[in-house]
Structure formats: C-alpha cells, structure tokens
C-alpha cells in the first residue's frame, strides 16, 4: 500500500484541528478535575447531554446547542440535589445522569430520525464539517484563555478553599465557573469522542500528568500535551485502520496511562522528580 499524505484531505485537516482544540481544553480542565475528585461529575454531564442532542436534531438546531442546554441543566440539578443534603453527592450525580441518559435512549428509539447513535456515543471526528470545527474553536478558545488566566485562583480552590475565602475570592463563583467550563468542554468533545468516551479526555491526561509531577504549573502543560498527542495518534490510527475515531483516541489515552504508570512504578525514586526540581 503506497504512503498517503493524510493532510491532503480536507476532512483530515478539519478532524485534526477540531481534535487538537478539544484536547487542549480538556487537557487543561483535567488537571483540576482529577485533583478535586470531579471525575464522576464529568461522567454525569457527558451522559446527560444525550437527550439534548436528540431534541436539537428534532428542532433542526446544531447538536451543540441541545447538548449545552442539558449539560447546564445537569450542573444545576446536581447542585440543587446536593444542597438539599437529603442524599449523598455521588448518589445525586448518579440519579441525574442515569435518568437523562435513559431519556435520551428512549427518545432515540421512539422518535423517527436519522440520528446515528454510534456517532453520538463514540464521536465522529473524521466526519466533522467546517461549521462544526468553527463551533468547537469558538467555544474552546475562550475557555482555554479563561482557564489560563484564572489558573492560580482555580489551583488555590482545588488545594485550599478556605484560603480562597480568606483572600476575598468567592469559592461559589470559582466553582460555578469551573462547572460551566466543564460543561462546555464536554459539549465540544462530543464531536471528538462522543458521549461515552468524552470523560476519558477529561480524566486520563490529568491523571498521567499527576504521575509525572506534583506541581500544578507543570501539569498545566503536560496534561494538554498528552491529550493532544493521544488525539493525533488516535485520529491517524482510525484513518488507517478504518476504526472509530473516538474509540481509537480513548484506547490511545489508556495505553499512554499504562506506559506512564509502569514507568513510574519501575523508577519510583527518580521518575518525575526532574520536573519538580525546576
């Protein structure tokens, strides 16, 4: 089989640009999500946007619009249930996301439409259109900029919320900002890895970075780098193997984590300390 320059194809160019934009945003967020123990929240939002996607399709709206609405609804509902203190926080999250995900599957099964369920669940980067790519960039770029600008405040929030209040900042405002950013990141990752695997982009890069360094300032460039490299490998692999792009990205992330974990285990006393000394 002769070598083919995959960059000569417009659909591959769109896939790579969309994938990189998504990886950078999710990679940044992953640092705080994993440190604050918000992995389940990310999983909840990613599953809860399914009915929004179906409803948006029925109304002739972009998928991202419906997904964003239900992502924000999920954040609000989980917050209200947690405030009631009647049920445990993890229970509240589980109830909300399973209910919405079930609603989405019912809508897909009962409402006549041309929705490709596999594309929603596992993503379809190779089928991204120019408007889709521009939507991801327009949403992702402001999020990335704001996260970088607020990284010190968010890092302080993740380590010591009491200190945040002591210096006059609002923990509620910062938490709300992070939740909205999380919702938006999951919405744009719908194009890349779909509903089910979007959580992998939000958890694995940060977990890998945490194995390599204990300092957040290093994690904030290592995590997006790992996410970006994994997306590039996943997209390339999906093209040559004719496999699911979302599945290949998720698999690549898993392999990268395993490699770093094994190396960390074998070189426990030296691996990762080089960065932390600088």
Model region roles, listed by residue range:
Residues 2-10, 24-35, 52-62, 153-163, ...:
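Short juxtamembrane and helix-loop transition motifs at transmembrane-helix boundaries
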Residues 246-250, 254-278:
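Cytosolic-side transmembrane-helix boundaries in multi-pass membrane proteins
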Residues 31-113, 209-221, 238-241, 264-266:
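Short loop segments and helix-boundary regions at transmembrane helix junctions
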Residues 15-18, 63-71, 90-94, 137, ...:
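Loop-to-transmembrane alpha-helix initiation sites
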Residues 2-14, 85, 89-153, 180:
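Transmembrane helix-bundle core of multi-pass membrane transporters
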Residues 133-205:
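Helix-loop-helix "hairpin" substructures at the membrane interface of multi-pass membrane proteins
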Residues 196-247:
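Transmembrane alpha-helical segments in multi-pass inner-membrane proteins
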Residues 1-24, 273, 277:
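Membrane-interfacial amphipathic/re-entrant helices at transmembrane-helix boundaries
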């Amino acid at each position: 089989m002769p070598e083919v320059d995959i960059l000569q194809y417009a659909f591959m160019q769109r896939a790579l640009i969309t994938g990189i934009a998504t990886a950078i945003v999710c990679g940044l967020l992953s640092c705080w999500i994993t440190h604050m123990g918000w992995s389940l929240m990310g999983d909840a939002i990613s599953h809860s946007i399914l009915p929004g996607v179906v409803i948006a399709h029925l109304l002739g709206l972009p998928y991202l619009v419906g997904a964003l609405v239900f992502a924000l609804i999920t954040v609000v509902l989980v917050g209200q249930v947690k405030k009631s203190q009647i049920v445990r926080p993890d229970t509240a999250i589980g109830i909300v996301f399973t209910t919405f995900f079930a609603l989405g599957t019912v809508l897909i099964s009962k409402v006549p439409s041309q929705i490709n369920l596999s594309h929603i669940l596992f993503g379809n980067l190779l089928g991204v259109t120019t408007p889709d790519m521009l939507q991801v960039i327009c949403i992702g770029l402001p999020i990335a900029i704001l996260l970088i600008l607020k990284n010190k405040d968010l890092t302080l929030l993740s380590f010591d919320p009491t200190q945040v209040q002591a210096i006059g900042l609002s923990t509620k405002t910062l938490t709300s900002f992070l939740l909205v950013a999380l919702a938006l990141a999951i919405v744009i990752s719908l194009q890349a890895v779909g509903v089910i695997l979007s959580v992998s982009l939000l958890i694995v890069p940060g977990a890998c970075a945490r194995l390599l360094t204990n300092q957040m300032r290093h994690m904030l460039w290592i995590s997006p780098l790992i996410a970006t490299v994994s997306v590039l490998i996943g997209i390339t692999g999906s093209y040559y193997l004719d496999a699911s792009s979302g599945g290949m990205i998720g698999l690549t992330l898993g392999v990268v984590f395993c490699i770093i974990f094994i190396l960390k285990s074998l070189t426990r006393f030296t691996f990762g300390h080089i960065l932390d000394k600088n």
